[in-house]
């Protein structure tokens, strides 16, 4: 198979694409892949590091108000479609896949106009603007949440789950918590606001430290690089008991997930895919700063299934954080029930499912 894939801007668009590429290579080591992204997005660093053929397109998103910038955006979009057509003619893909982000709009649209099979993957429960636009042109639409189905043409939709789930589903316990001087036999809570950290989650966690120090469970608090120094400088040398550890960033987060009893964090699509694939109980604090409040919708899908609890960011304090963790970590039965419900929602073969969709559209 010759696969052209496009997505970018955030990890939520990039990691599903990389998971699909891994699955394709596992099935067909001779497969050829080209990734089209932007020169400024996260993909410009991550994708070439994997040894994947990488091309760039210059594009920007629409402003939500009337703006001269939107005139420039239309011009850049049309120009980027021309560039995408050149890449497509040179690479000759069997199928073109978009995983979200403005750049995928130009690439997938160009492919559809050239009568090349096209598929888009929507990671969230609320459909992104690019995928909404592309839905009328593509052959198939893969979704990760059932709640996204009604937002697309019904005959095109296939439920596959998020390919990222397959990458983490088979990870086993490896004693990874030992590197943080944590005991693998004691239940551990992970507090994590995403790769950049989340100020409100961090503030609540800092306020909770005096109580967390007293608990018989462990806490691993990951602040995000930009917040770490300020938080550490604000704590005295004796502020942390041995059962509470603070880290700026964890390079290989999937490796520690099987050893975590509870996660408190955001409700991004990648996080949801990981915690359901592994069946980890979670306390979700959706970001209120994302488009169409899609993280709340993502979280609600788990809450409705008894697989997670939800705390609005405005309601998150040190006290509410400790109460939520206590409720799960001091009740093995409650935790096991939630873990089982989370596991039921997981799709550990999501990348293979999406790969099958690609095979069906290739004429």
Swiss-Prot record:
Transmembrane segments: none
EC number, as in UniProt: 2.4.1.227
Keywords per UniProt: Cell cycle, Cell division, Cell membrane, Cell shape, Cell wall biogenesis/degradation, Glycosyltransferase, Membrane, Peptidoglycan synthesis, Transferase
Subcellular location: Cell membrane
Leading EC class: transferase
GO CC terms: plasma membrane
Catalyzed reactions: Mur2Ac(oyl-L-Ala-gamma-D-Glu-L-Lys-D-Ala-D-Ala)-di-trans,octa-cis-undecaprenyl diphosphate + UDP-N-acetyl-alpha-D-glucosamine = beta-D-GlcNAc-(1->4)-Mur2Ac(oyl-L-Ala-gamma-D-Glu-L-Lys-D-Ala-D-Ala)-di-trans,octa-cis-undecaprenyl diphosphate + UDP + H(+)
Record Pfam families: Glyco_tran_28_C, Glyco_transf_28
Chain residues that bind UDP-N-acetyl-alpha-D-glucosamine: 10-12, 124, 195, 250, 295
The protein's annotated pathway: Cell wall biogenesis; peptidoglycan biosynthesis
Role noted for this protein: Cell wall formation. Catalyzes the transfer of a GlcNAc subunit on undecaprenyl-pyrophosphoryl-MurNAc-pentapeptide (lipid intermediate I) to form undecaprenyl-pyrophosphoryl-MurNAc-(pentapeptide)GlcNAc (lipid intermediate II).
Homology family: Belongs to the glycosyltransferase 28 family. MurG subfamily.
Protein name, UniProt field: UDP-N-acetylglucosamine--N-acetylmuramyl-(pentapeptide) pyrophosphoryl-undecaprenol N-acetylglucosamine transferase
């Amino acid at each position: 198979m010759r696969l052209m894939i496009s997505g970018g801007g955030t990890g939520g668009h990039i990691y599903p694409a990389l998971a699909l590429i891994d699955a394709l290579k596992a099935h067909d080591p001779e497969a050829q892949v080209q990734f089209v992204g932007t020169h400024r997005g996260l993909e410009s660093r991550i994708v070439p590091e994997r040894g994947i053929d990488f091309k760039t397109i210059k594009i920007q998103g629409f402003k939500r108000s009337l703006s001269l910038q939107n005139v420039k955006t239309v011009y850049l979009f049309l120009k980027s479609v021309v560039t995408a057509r050149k890449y497509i003619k040179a690479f000759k893909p069997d199928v073109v896949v978009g995983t979200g982000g403005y750049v995928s709009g130009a690439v997938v649209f160009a492919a559809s106009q050239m009568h090349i099979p096209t598929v888009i993957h929507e990671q969230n429960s609320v459909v992104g603007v690019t995928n909404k636009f592309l839905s009328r042109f593509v052959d198939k639409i893969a979704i990760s949440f059932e709640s996204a189905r009604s937002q697309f043409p019904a005959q095109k939709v296939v439920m596959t789950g998020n390919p990222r789930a397959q990458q983490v589903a088979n990870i086993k316990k490896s004693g990874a918590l030992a590197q943080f001087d944590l005991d693998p036999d004691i239940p551990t809570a992970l507090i994590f606001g995403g790769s950049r950290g989340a100020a409100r989650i961090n503030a609540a966690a800092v306020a909770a430290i005096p109580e967390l120090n007293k608990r018989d469970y462990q806490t691993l608090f990951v602040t995000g690089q930009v917040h770490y120094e300020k938080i550490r400088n604000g704590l005295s040398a004796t502020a942390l008991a041995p059962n509470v550890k603070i880290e700026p960033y964890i390079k290989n987060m999937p490796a520690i997930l099987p050893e975590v009893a509870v996660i408190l964090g955001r409700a991004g699509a990648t996080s949801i895919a990981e915690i359901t694939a592994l069946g980890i109980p979670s306390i979700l604090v959706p970001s209120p700063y994302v488009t169409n409040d899609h993280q709340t919708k993502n979280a609600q899908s788990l809450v409705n299934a008894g697989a997670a609890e939800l705390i609005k960011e405005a309601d998150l304090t040190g006290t509410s954080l400790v109460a939520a963790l206590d409720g799960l970590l001091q009740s093995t039965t409650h935790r096991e029930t939630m873990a089982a419900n989370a596991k039921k929602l997981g799709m550990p073969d999501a990348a293979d499912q999406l790969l099958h969709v690609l095979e069906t559209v290739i004429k």
